[in-house]
């Protein structure tokens, strides 16, 4: 039986199934966000497409005349960069604990806001609130990624070579 004070410190080693399940969940959150970004590229209902004008819509996408396509590309790059940073950080972990999993859930919440931020920028690109929301979304992702790295270092979840003396403390 785990004591109440030890609930957040239960460690799951890298070789265990819990570590693999958590990693798969973290990666799938980014995949869902990227998929939802792509779904929102054309924000018109399917019944609005006419065979005689479809090529113009497609040409608009390819020439980046559709603000949703531009928002998709920019947001895709940002989500991809955050996923890569998270992936590289997790590659150096020897274990995870419940506090790290909880912090990752908060991080995934902000990752899955990517389609909302992209739609806000695509549909209201001149609105300062939309721009502010997009900036706040990026700041929240950055802060959460820093929190994850800090938490992993604080809980000694990194491999010994990463936890050892470094030039940054």
Residue ranges and their predicted role:
Residues 1-169:
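Multi-pass alpha-helical transmembrane bundle typical of ion/small-solute transporters
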């Amino acid at each position: 039986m785990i004591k109440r004070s030890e609930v957040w410190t239960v460690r799951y080693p890298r070789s265990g199934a819990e570590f693999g399940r958590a990693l798969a969940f973290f990666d799938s959150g980014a995949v869902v966000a990227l998929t939802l970004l792509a779904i929102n590229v054309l924000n018109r209902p399917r019944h609005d497409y006419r065979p005689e004008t479809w090529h113009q819509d497609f040409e608009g996408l390819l020439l980046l005349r559709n603000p949703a396509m531009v928002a998709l590309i920019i947001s895709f790059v940002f989500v991809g960069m955050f996923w890569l940073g998270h992936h590289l950080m997790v590659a150096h972990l020897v274990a995870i604990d419940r506090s790290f999993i909880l912090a990752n859930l908060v991080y995934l919440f902000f990752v899955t806001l990517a389609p909302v931020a992209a739609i806000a920028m695509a549909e209201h690109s001149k609105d300062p609130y939309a721009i502010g929301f997009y900036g706040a979304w990026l700041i929240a992702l950055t802060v959460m990624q820093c929190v994850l790295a800090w938490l992993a270092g604080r809980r000694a979840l990194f491999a010994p070579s990463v936890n050892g003396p470094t030039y940054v403390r």
